[in-house]
Amino acid sequence: MMGPMSTREPTIEIDARRFWSTVMRSGQIGPGKAGGLRRLALTDADKEMRDLFVTWCTEAGCTITVDRVGNIFARRPGRDDHLPPVLMGSHLDTQVAGGKYDGIVGVLAGLEVLRTLDARRVATKRPLELVCWTNEEGARFTPPMVASGAFASVFDVDWVLALRDDDGKVFGSELERIGYDGKTAVGGRGIDAYFELHIEQGPILDREAVPVGIVVGGYATRGMHVDVHGETAHAGPTPMDRRRNALVGAAMLAVAVNEVGWNYHATEGKATVARMVAWPNKAGILSEYAQLTCDVRHAEREVADRMWAEVKAAMPECARRANVEMRIAGEWQFGSERFDPGCIRLIREAAEQLKVPHRDILSQAGHDAYYISRIAPTAMIFTPCRDGISHNEAEHAELDYTVPGVNVLLHSVLSRANR
């Protein structure tokens, strides 16, 4: 390999056609019903995409390792291979009715960086690693971002491996079934820095026609599963005052959560119930059990904490009115982190060097970068998506508005890896 190219050299750029053809190829694996993707974690479609990703990375000169929760690491050696690596990454799994770009663009942007360096025979002082995090979406195994969370010691590895989907299938068993039950330890190793490129999943960059968002941090997010316990009974003869319908209790709490969101709407607060299940969930019978998943989000951590307290305060009254029992089955929080100033500076310098219009921005969605920021200097780059639509098969991104961000990623990583 040649020596490291100066990161001030403006001529090195990615191969835009190669990058976009890779994104389009990914968009053929796990097709949805309306033009998007349904590629849930650890399904056959996920395996097909993972296998192709590994092939691409190997062809770019990388060595592959897989850890116990299925995270894939593609390593490109550095001139001093004993130094901690600079990481890039995101995820390849999607929502049930997801788009072709969420997470995927970030992983394949990292791949294009590796391909570009390989084609140009550019060596870096530090090794580079591209990571595909498992089950970022949490669409099949909840909560989201469990594998990056395990890597950052937020979640216990054995707890992650024991998670079950709605059909009772076990995370660890599904990893084994698709051949990605790796043997490498999860986390516990040195990282110089982590960079993640991602579509914004909001309307700001698209509305302002700005191709690069420099993510300085994220909305504080608080989430939980709530179990509701009642009693089965006949829907006909059972008097209203004797009913213990778990589904009604869950529905009351769902309305209360939504009201908290509206109460903070003026300051861009959000409260959501995104999932609800009930058993037996049949006509003519009251539900004995229900579970809902909810969260609150706000740019200010103190306000998010206040919103969360209001949600929890609503639980006893909802339980009393429905004559049921409620308990919190699990909680999580993320997003109140602020990203590393040094990594942010490198992104800003790269954007200015390449004359790419950019602006600072906060992330309002959850990302693997949040958990990695707890153990390593981290920053994110946002690129636009049309009308801010995401977690929807209509999600769309344009080549011309995505490539500038990938070039900024390339130069940011080069700068960091050559320190």
Predicted regions and their residues:
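Zn-dependent metallopeptidase/amidohydrolase metal-coordination segment
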Residues: 19-32, 89-90, 358-408, 413-416
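Midchain, well-structured core segments that form catalytic/ion-binding scaffolds
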Residues: 135-136, 140-302
